[in-house]
From Swiss-Prot:
Family matches, as InterPro entries: Hyethyz_kinase, Ribokinase-like
Binding site for substrate: M47, A196
Gene encoding the protein: thiM
Organism: Finegoldia magna (strain ATCC 29328 / DSM 20472 / WAL 2508) (Peptostreptococcus magnus)
Residues that hold ATP according to the record: K123, T170
Full protein name: Hydroxyethylthiazole kinase
Cofactor names: Mg(2+)
Length: 268
């Protein structure tokens, strides 16, 4: 764990000494929250999704986020263009599998992207990761089914071996898997009562990957989000909780992350 903490400290420092351009191809439901999250940790969001401009924007970016929520034909065209440009220019890509467990269109798009391109990080909740692993739909909605952690770890390991991507599975325990596996147990149940918080995690991962294309960068991004929400007063309502989360994201110090992180490395 000492190596994890040391590397996360370096990534945190690099992140806060940078102002990288993060190209987010996302949905109308989460776009504002994601842009604010990127800004809150000192990076610059660019939310372009017009197929006529995305190649130029991606080419200038330091990281690309592809979010499959509320997908449209228009954005599918943009996604395919941006992913190609990112690969050609060694720009890290975070692919957030929003809704792939409920939509054949999204699952087929994901499989097509993974067949033809290299993805730095594949992120989804337990159900979405399981659906990608079995290549089939598994639920009527976008929230996780009650899957066992060990089952999801097995899915993550197999997906990492197949696609050589960092795999992030979010749930009660967050799983981050590459050549090593970390279980993260920070967080707050209130996150599940606010829309787009999972999408925000994806945008934070895109930010940390812009300075380090590593599993530790993903652990840092998730921990920043989860520890920030833990620091919000337990007595406040959901609107105040959301505001407090963004306040904490913008002010969280490395020492707070180091002191509060609940991470466990498991045998891979």
């Amino acid at each position: 764990m000492d190596n994890l903490i040391q590397k996360m400290s370096e990534i945190y420092s690099d992140l806060h000494n940078s102002n990288n351009l993060i190209h987010c191809l996302t949905n109308a439901i989460s776009i504002n929250d994601m842009a604010n999250a990127v800004l809150s940790i000192g990076q610059s969001p660019f939310m372009a999704d017009n197929p006529r401009e995305v190649e130029d924007v991606t080419r200038k970016s330091d990281s690309l986020l592809v979010n499959l929520g509320n997908i449209t034909d228009y954005r599918i065209e943009s996604i395919k263009k941006s992913v190609r440009i990112a690969n050609e220019n060694n720009i890290p890509i975070t692919l957030d599998l929003v809704g792939v467990s409920a939509s054949k269109l999204r699952l087929d798009l994901t499989l097509d992207i993974l067949k033809n391109h290299t993805i730095t990080c594949i992120k989804g909740n337990y159900s979405e990761i399981k659906s990608l692993f079995i290549k089939d739909l598994s639920t009527k909605g976008v929230d996780s089914q009650k899957l066992e952690v060990d089952d999801v770890i097995n899915c993550c390991k197999n997906l990492h071996e197949k696609y050589d991507s960092i795999i992030v599975a979010t749930g009660q325990t967050d799983i981050v898997c590459a050549n090593e596996i970390y279980l993260l147990n920070n967080g707050d149940d209130r996150l599940s009562k606010i829309t787009a918080t999972g999408c925000v995690v994806g945008s934070l991962i895109a930010c940390t990957l812009s300075v380090s294309q590593s599993i530790k960068a993903c652990v840092l991004a998730i921990s920043m989000m989860n520890i920030s929400c833990e620091m919000v007063d337990k007595s406040v309502g959901l609107s105040s909780f959301k505001l407090g989360l963004y306040d904490n994201l913008s002010r969280i110090k490395w020492e707070q992350i180091k002191e509060n992180i609940d991470a466990k490395k498991v045998e891979s």
